Regions:
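Catalytic-core helical/loop segments in enzymes performing group transfer/polymerization on anionic/lipid-linked
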Residues: 1-586
Length: 586
């Protein structure tokens, strides 16, 4: 346990969202005058900030999921996912097979990571405080969103706490919270976009007729547009370039460019990848067998006395079967026809998840050269637990069905040397990240915005995982991320002629303004959310991070890196240890 002082609590309260904190305050406002009676565990900085405005201090959840807990949970995750891989398989008429199981595991693993973390925190907290009464907020009705992730209306902490309290014979009180299950504005907007996209797709299919050898990319995310532009300028005029997936606005601009002087560097050749398609009778029969095996497996899942199989069973029947299995079938059907029609000579992608996983598998089945250009960092793992997480993550980014994989950094090369690889490595140097920074005159003005030329600038950049994309051990939770910032601000405030820039992207609704309210008052730091990261990296003297692609961005540009991990939980790369013990500075 990270928190070592042990005190008995009369009331132990678990809160995850602001609406839960609000209804809790309304119910217990008078009793909260005796603050010592209540210990509140916050699962999100927004809750902590909201309570602070009412003069109430909450304890962050991550304190009750220490290193040993993360390691244990990764072993449980590995056991569960391997049960699926060993016992469940599904193949369609195009030959696509691995994508069904891997796409499902990708979604299930994220869901399980959140649930297991919450179970671990609630269990450890109850054992630590030995409360007389546990309080949590239960949403009504229980709602399963049509989403392959866990949505904000899908809340399970009250059920978790209730099961644990029942087993330990502790009084449990739940507060009912009415939650609107449908956002009609979003539904209408989504429906209109789908309709307009269909019209746009049909128009493009008619007017597009690439006459040259075609190179396609799955998306332009993570800098893939730069890769396409580089290719266009470096290879002969015998090739044309196109993207399968573009956001609606970008797709519209791309098409308009065909009729104006603003001709885009790459074309837009969409695929009807999300259009529903009924499976053939053989596939439907195989899918039913697959689903029965899967449900039998997950119904047996229980962790620390909490039944999680029933939740996942419901999630699968209501959502994952249609949104993962059926959509993977649709991707396979439509992408197979797409590849047959356009006959690309090369397929590129920055990741291999969902439709891009099917694209990679089909490319290999059809003997179309394909290359994975990983959008994220991969480094050699130095312990068996972080290795479990990295190897699983690699299946969608660097160890994929694509025939080739671009090796962009020496650390990626070292990582690949230690795994059984599906792809052929090609040393390309930096493509999506780690490129040499061009120091422009504008950067001088950016630096002077924060500090004088004689001052030292420290840049903090991290990649915490939001609630719907939970990951264990190798990434910070969002409350742990903010806690680290607090410590950095306190440390830098004691230094002369040093300024800390917190490079922050809004996550899970936590705005820069709310974040500032959680940080100490100091003139020694600034929060930067706008502009290109490369510009900020070019003005920094030292990068500070937990685990992020920004680490390799800095190292590739000869900028020193400080791995900052207060609780010594994870070491992203080997370095010189500056401070040992609990500080976790490397």
């Amino acid at each position: 346990m990270i928190i070592r002082d042990k005190k008995k609590a009369d009331y132990l309260v678990f809160l995850e969202f602001i609406d839960e904190a609000d209804i809790f305050l309304k119910k217990y406002l008078n009793e909260l005058e005796s603050a010592d009676k209540f210990t509140i565990i916050s699962f999100h900085p927004l809750v902590k900030s909201y309570l602070l405005k009412h003069g109430i201090v909450a304890v962050d959840s991550f304190h009750f999921c220490p290193t040993a807990s993360h390691q244990k949970l990764l072993c449980v995750l590995e056991e569960y996912t391997e049960q699926i891989r060993r016992n469940c398989c599904l193949k369609d008429s195009t030959g696509v097979e691995d994508s069904y199981v891997e796409n499902l595991i990708y979604s299930i693993r994220s869901i399980l990571s959140l649930w297991l973390y919450q179970i671990e925190v609630v269990s450890n907290t109850i054992e630590h405080y030995l409360p007389e009464t546990v309080v949590s907020v239960r949403p009504e009705p229980i709602y399963i969103e049509q989403n392959i992730w866990i949505g904000n209306n899908e809340r399970f902490i009250a059920d978790i706490a209730g099961q644990i309290c029942n087993a330990k014979k502790i009084v449990f009180k739940s507060i009912a919270l009415q939650i609107g299950s449908r956002n009609f504005r979003k539904m209408i907007s989504r429906g209109l976009k789908k309709k307009l996209s269909g019209i746009l797709y049909s128009t493009i299919q008619v007017i597009s007729n690439p006459e040259k050898k075609l190179i396609i990319a799955s998306v332009i995310d993570f800098g893939m547009d730069k890769v396409l532009n580089d290719l266009k300028h470096k290879i002969s005029g015998d090739y044309s370039f196109a993207v399968i997936g573009l956001p609606f606005k970008a797709a519209f601009r791309n098409m308009c460019g065909l009729f104006t002087k603003n001709i885009p560097d790459y074309g837009y050749l969409p695929c009807y990848k999300n259009r529903n398609i009924n499976g053939d009778s053989e596939f439907v029969e195989d899918k039913n067998k697959f689903s029965k095996k899967l449900i039998k497996i997950i119904n047996g899942w229980k962790y620390r006395g909490v039944l999680i199989g029933s939740w996942l069973n419901q999630k699968y029947k209501n959502c994952l079967e249609s949104e993962v299995i059926d959509k993977t079938y649709g991707h396979s059907y439509h992408l197979n026809r797409y590849l047959e029609k356009w006959k690309p000579v090369l397929v590129l992608s920055p990741y291999s998840r969902l439709f891009s996983a099917v694209l990679g598998e089909l490319s290999c089945l059809r003997n179309i050269p394909s290359m994975m250009i990983p959008h994220g960092t991969f480094t050699p793992a130095y312990d068996e637990y972080s290795k479990k997480e990295w190897n699983e993550n690699a299946l969608g980014i660097i160890n994929t069905p694509y025939k080739y994989v671009a090796v962009q950094t020496p650390l990626a090369e070292k990582y690949l040397s230690g795994v059984s690889l599906n792809s052929k490595p090609v040393i390309t140097g930096p493509l999506l990240f780690g490129r040499q920074i061009k120091r422009l005159n504008d950067v001088v003005f950016l630096r002077r915005k924060y500090a004088s030329d004689a001052d030292v600038i420290i840049l903090h950049a991290g990649t915490p995982k939001h609630r719907s994309g939970s990951r264990l051990l190798n990434y910070e939770t969002i409350d742990e991320y903010v806690d680290g910032m607090v410590s950095l601000v306190n440390a830098v405030s004691k230094l002369n002629r040093v300024h800390l820039i917190l490079r922050y992207r809004q996550i899970d609704g936590l705005s820069s303004e709310t974040l500032k309210g959680l940080l100490p008052e100091s003139d020694s730091y600034s929060i930067a959310s706008e502009g290109a990261f490369s510009d900020y990296l070019s003005i920094t003297n030292l990068l500070v991070s937990f685990s992020s692609t920004t680490i390799e961005e800095a190292l590739q540009n000869n900028i020193p890196v400080l791995l900052f991990n207060k609780y010594n939980r994870y070491q992203h790369i080997k370095g010189v240890e500056l401070s040992s013990g609990s500080s976790g500075l490397f």
